[in-house]
Structures are given as structure tokens and as C-alpha cells.
Amino acid sequence: MTTTHIDQVSVSTQASVYFDGKCISHGVTLADGTKKSVGVILPATLTFNTGAPEVMECVAGSCDYKLPGSEVWLKSKPGDKFSIPGNTPFDIRVTEPYHYICHFG
């Protein structure tokens, strides 16, 4: 099921903007201290580097992603999630706005 809203959170009002505006997100902290980001990636092919482990959840649009050591692009659509280990690069390819929640840790 696709997450449609997150209750009882603190939201960073200043956006994090990456890749010349191709990725824009806002940090979210839940009441229990859990951190997430909510954002959008505009059409592009990008390489991200994780710090902590991440779970990417697609809430609208779609993307293709490729994890390290793989040459295979996998598809993520609304309701799908994929995991990336910490301190790891991954590639993402977007042909339409991809709206996501990034779950950290």
C-alpha cells in the first residue's frame, strides 16, 4: 500500500536541493525520533550515495534503479519499496516525476 500521509511529524521547511534541482526533498522527524525525507526526483539519470541504510518508497510516478554490483535496472512504481545498504552508491533513472519517501536506518 502506498503511504498517503504521515501524522505527528516535524518538517524541515528548507528544502534540500540536489543535482541542479533534479531532486528536491524535505526532512521529516517523527515523534519517536525516526528520520525520513519526502521528495521528488525530476526526469534524469542520477547516482546517489547513501550514508545510512535507506528504504525508498514510491508514492507516485515510477523509476528504474540499479544497485551496486548489478547491471540490471529494476522498476519501482507506487507502493513499491527498495532497500539500499549504508555507504553505498546506487543509480536511479526517472522519466516522469518520481515522488518518494526515504526511510533512513
UniProtKB/Swiss-Prot annotation:
Q: Which domain of life is it from?
A: Bacteria
- CDD domains per record: cupin_PpnP-like
**Keyword annotations of the record:** Glycosyltransferase, Transferase
Q: In its keyword annotation, does this UniProt entry include Transport?
A: no
* GO molecular function ontology, one term from the record: guanosine phosphorylase activity
Name a GO CC annotation attached to this entry. Answer: cytosol
Known role: Catalyzes the phosphorolysis of diverse nucleosides, yielding D-ribose 1-phosphate and the respective free bases. Can use uridine, adenosine, guanosine, cytidine, thymidine, inosine and xanthosine as substrates. Also catalyzes the reverse reactions.
Disulfide bridge partners, by residue number? none
Its protein name is Pyrimidine/purine nucleoside phosphorylase
Record-linked HAMAP family: Nucleos_phosphorylase_PpnP
Sorted alphabetically, which Pfam families does this protein's record hold?
Ppnp
EC number(s) stated in the UniProt entry for this protein:
2.4.2.1, 2.4.2.2
- State whether keyword tRNA-binding applies: no
- The species this protein belongs to is Albidiferax ferrireducens (strain ATCC BAA-621 / DSM 15236 / T118)
Its family remark reads: Belongs to the nucleoside phosphorylase PpnP family.
| Reactions catalysed | a purine D-ribonucleoside + phosphate = a purine nucleobase + alpha-D-ribose 1-phosphate; adenosine + phosphate = alpha-D-ribose 1-phosphate + adenine; cytidine + phosphate = cytosine + alpha-D-ribose 1-phosphate; guanosine + phosphate = alpha-D-ribose 1-phosphate + guanine
The protein's gene is named ppnP
Query: Which residues are the signal sequence here?
Result: none
